[in-house]
Each structure stands twice: as C-alpha cells, then as structure tokens.
Amino acid sequence: MSNLSTHAAQTARRYSVVPRHPRPGAIVVVSAVLLSLLALLPLGFVIGVAFETGWQTVKALVFRPRVAELLLNTLLLVVLTLPICAVLGVALAWLTERTTLPGRRLWAVLATAPLAVPAFVQSYAWISLVPSMHGLGAGVFISVLAYFPFIYLPAAAVLRRLDPGIEDVATSLGSRPPAVFFRVVLPQLKLAVCGGSLLIALHLLAEYGLYAMIRFDTFTTAIFDQFQSTFNGPAANMLAGVLVLCCLGLLLLEAISRGRARYARVGSGSARSQTPRRLSPPLAALALLLPIALTALALGVPFITLARWLWLGGFEVWRNAELWPALWQTLSLSAAGALLITLCAIPMAWLSVRYPARLYRVLEGCNYVTSSLPGIVVALALVTITIHSFRPIYQTEITLLLAYLLMFMPRALINLRAGIAQAPVELENVARSLGKSPAQALWSTTLRLAAPGVAAGAALVFLAIANELTATLLLAPNGTRTLATGFWALTSEIDYVAAAPYALIMVALSLPLTWLLYSQSKRTAGL
C-alpha cells in the first residue's frame, strides 16, 4: 500500500510541474492589451475630433450637399457592385466545382488571378485603353472585375465540401434542378456570400486610386483631395467620420444578414464524393462564355495594356533611375512591416487559441474593427496625432509602419491563430514531461507546427504593404517612393509608358498571394 502511495505521489509531482492550462504570462497579456488599445486609435480619434469640434460645426460640415452627393455615390457604388459580384462569383464557382466544364481546374485558378492585379492598376489599364471611361458606370465595371474573386473563393470552397446527398434527397422528393439550387444549395452559400460581400464593400469604401483615376468622387477621394489641397483638418475629419459610420454600418448589416444560422452535416456515415453534373456539348460551349469573358476582361486587358506600353517604351523604361530604388524601398518596407506585424500578432493569437476567454475575444475584435476602416482614416488619424503630440515622428518610417500595423494586423492574426491551433497544448505538455525545458518544448512542438501559419500570415502582410497606396501617399517620409507611389506619380502625369514597369512588378509580386489564397481555399475544403 505504501509503495502504491509513493508511486502516486511521484506521479502527481511529476505532472504537477506541467499544468494543463497555466495562466498566460503577464508580458503576453500586457502586450495584447496595449496593441488592442492602439488598434482603437483611429476610431477614438474620429470620436474625439467630433466632440472637440462641437455639434454646430459638425452639423455645418456634415449636413451639406457635397456630403449628400458623396454618400449617394458610395451607396450606388456598393448597391450596384455587390449583386453583380455575387452573381458572377457564385455562377463561376458552380461551373468550376459542380459541373464538367472543360478545363475547370484551369478556370478555377484564373478566377482567382484578378486579385494579383491591384485595383488601381486595373483602372490604369482600362483608362489607358478607353480614355472616356469615367463616372459611376466605369467605377462599377472596374470594381466588379477587380473584386469578384472575393465571393468566388469562399463560394467555391463551400461547394467543394457540400454533401451532394442533400441535393439528392431534394431531387428524390420531386424538386427540379433549379429549385434544388435555390432552396438547398444557395442557402448554404449565404455565409460565404455575406462574408465576401462585406469584404468587397469595405474595399469599395477604402479604395482611392481606382476611383481617382476615373474621376469618380467617393468619400476617400474627397478626403484625400481636401487634405492635399487645403490641409483643412475639420472638413477632412468630418468626412472621415461619415466614412467610419458607413464602415460600421456595413459590419452591422452583414452581421444581421448572416444571422445565427449555421450549417452542419449530422447523422452516421461520411459525406460521399461529389459527381460533377455533366454538361452537353452545346451547354458546355455556352457555359464557357462566362469564364472566358471574365478572364479576358479582368486579366487579358491589363496584361495586353501593359505589354503595349512596355513595347512602346522599349528597354528605356527599365532604365528609369527611380524604378529600382522604388523596388528596394518597397521590399524593405514590406519586409520590415511583415516582421513587425507578425511579431505583434503573436501575443493576441496565442491568447485567442490557448485562453479563449471573453476578455481576449473582445481584445481580438478591436483589431478586426480597425482593419475594416479605410487606410485614409488611419492615415489621417496618425497625421493629426503626430503633428500635435509626437512631432518628431511625423512623416517618418515609424509612423508609416504603425499605420501598416493598424491596417494589416488581422491578416497575420488569422493565419497565426490557425497555425497555433495546429499545435495543441497537450503536445507541449508531453514534451515537457519528457524532460524538455519550457523553451525547448515550445520550440520543438508549437513553433514548428505553427510555422506554416506564421509564414502565410507574414506573406499576406508583405504583399498587402507592397501594394498599399493611400496611407503611404500621406505618411511616407519626403523622398520615399515605393512601387505604388511611383506608379501613381507617373500616371498622374499621364506618363503611362513609364508607369508600366511599376505596374508589372507589382503584379509579379502579387502572384504568390493569388496562389496562396487559392491553396488556402482548397485546404479549407479539405482537399
């Protein structure tokens, strides 16, 4: 009996040094809290400026015809663009995932590829081809070509993992194929379409270069013009406040439309593999028109336009003295930003996965709310704050990197969460019970398993910074020129030939992002 007690005591002591759910370290918690409070800086700035300005001034600046015009433009842009993107994205997802469309795997990759072309490069391609493209119609057309993959990707992922048995049951009960699609399949695409639509809508509100190039006024272009022309703080800040309200309204609307509905397969057995719906030759030829048309418009026109300008410019365009320094500046800023943001995201991701308490979920949510705000709002907040309170860092790389941190933290956070979730705490505990130190256990289990998620998050941040235009224009130090700002300066001078190499390099840098997003969507579907 005593031997058994002694053995039990030794076992208890051995495992007591490896608690299953230890408390998070103070440094981790404090870091997460400080970063989350920092993330609320732009939102707090807008609210603070509104209170400081006073109701009478706010009313005079907000309730005027110009703001009504901008609001109408924004609403029309969103209301017209989203349904078209939804129809095209879902239709293309259905054709590539659930039918025998010829070359459907190739079309699936090409449907993602427009994300490699920055929206302002897409606009540059079309405006240089059709100089008369201006206004709302042009804005909707180019926005659809630039952003429809944001609905295609999640819709395709859902269709890949959807159990076809559900559709078979509906068919056996007498429903015809169109009724099966609208009553069975489409409701299960609701979450994907709502999420993709929200992402597109936020891009529409935040985009500057696309709409400035086609001379279509939105809140972002108006704020930038106000800031550049008169440095009128109150007017620009009030426009930013209205823009923030629009973004928060979109978040609320998406949450309401999404509802609490969730879809899951229940019952015994596993979902059977899908059998693509066979298309007859005439129907297949007709169905091919959609991916061919979208590929030609979203990819063919930009690449043909770039090839044309590069051909006209010859080798001289590559000898531009500012091109290669701009590439180096872009790579260095992107690398520094990716490293900084990934390191800053680790504490929050760690707490979110290992200690999913309500407080930590709220802290994590602060970062997502801020990332929904347009870059122009973040930049305007940092410009005003640094001028008034931290003048030494105004228009320095510190402020620029801080803006990137506020804007792109969720891109690293989401991937870090997924990576850390691949390394359950039990594996770390087992390693420590086998004699490894906490640091060795962390390195040999958690960090190794989380490495792909860390790398994916850093890559997404790197590529986002490489193509960022609006905040960089406002915050970059004097003399700093990235590929995006260099491209913008040349297109503003109507020097489309000299701008072509900048655009081509940005597209080349974005191609890995396209492949990464496509691969992630396949992994999400379990393929």
Swiss-Prot record:
Cited PANTHER family: FE(3+)-TRANSPORT SYSTEM PERMEASE PROTEIN FBPB 2, INNER MEMBRANE ABC TRANSPORTER PERMEASE PROTEIN YDCV
InterPro entries xref list: MetI-like, MetI-like_sf
Topology relative to the membrane: Multi-pass membrane protein
Subcellular location(s) of the protein: Cell inner membrane
Known role: Part of the ABC transporter complex FbpABC (TC 3.A.1.10.1) involved in Fe(3+) ions import. Probably responsible for the translocation of the substrate across the membrane.
Type- repeats: 10-15, 66-70, 167-177, 274-280, 319-323, 428-438
Family according to the record: Belongs to the binding-protein-dependent transport system permease family. FbpB subfamily.
Statement: the UniProt record of this protein carries the keyword Cell division: no
Gene behind this protein: fbpB
Listed name of the protein: Fe(3+)-transport system permease protein SfuB
Cystine pairs: none
ABC transmembrane type-1 domain: residues covered: 71-254, 327-517
CDD domains tied to this protein: TM_PBP2
Subunit and partners: The complex is composed of two ATP-binding proteins (FbpC), two transmembrane proteins (FbpB) and a solute-binding protein (FbpA).
Keywords: Cell inner membrane, Cell membrane, Ion transport, Iron, Iron transport, Membrane, Repeat, Transmembrane, Transmembrane helix, Transport
Main location: membrane
